[in-house]
Amino acid sequence: MPRSLKKGPFVDDHLLKKVDVQNEKNTKQVIKTWSRRSTIIPDFIGHTFAVHDGRKHVPVFVTESMVGHKLGEFAPTRTFKGHIKDDRKSKRR
């Protein structure tokens, strides 16, 4: 179920402060974060976040089309290696 509109989007305070500081200084450094649950707001457009996927930090450059989504949606936590091919010749012998 989506979040109530009267509450507004959830963004961690420390993340919002880091973005505000960079906007004041007009710098665009990578912001390292573990907050996958934070919603992307219009203030984040143009910034790069290093979102933790459980193992490493994945760089995510925020564009207009990402607004309203969560940061964790753009840093997958599982790597799919593919299914193993079924080798029938070796099973028969």
Curated annotation (Swiss-Prot):
GO molecular function term, any single one: rRNA binding
Keyword Ribosomal protein: yes
GO biological process, one term: ribosomal small subunit assembly
Disulfides per UniProt: none
UniProt-listed InterPro entries: Ribosomal_uS19, Ribosomal_uS19_bac-type, Ribosomal_uS19_CS, Ribosomal_uS19_SF
Keywords: Ribonucleoprotein, Ribosomal protein, RNA-binding, rRNA-binding
GO CC annotation terms, alphabetical: cytoplasm; small ribosomal subunit
Domain of life: Bacteria
Keyword Secreted: no
Function: Protein S19 forms a complex with S13 that binds strongly to the 16S ribosomal RNA.
PANTHER family: RIBOSOMAL PROTEIN S19P FAMILY MEMBER, SMALL RIBOSOMAL SUBUNIT PROTEIN US19M
Family from the record: Belongs to the universal ribosomal protein uS19 family.
Protein name: Small ribosomal subunit protein uS19
Organism per entry: Mycobacterium marinum (strain ATCC BAA-535 / M)
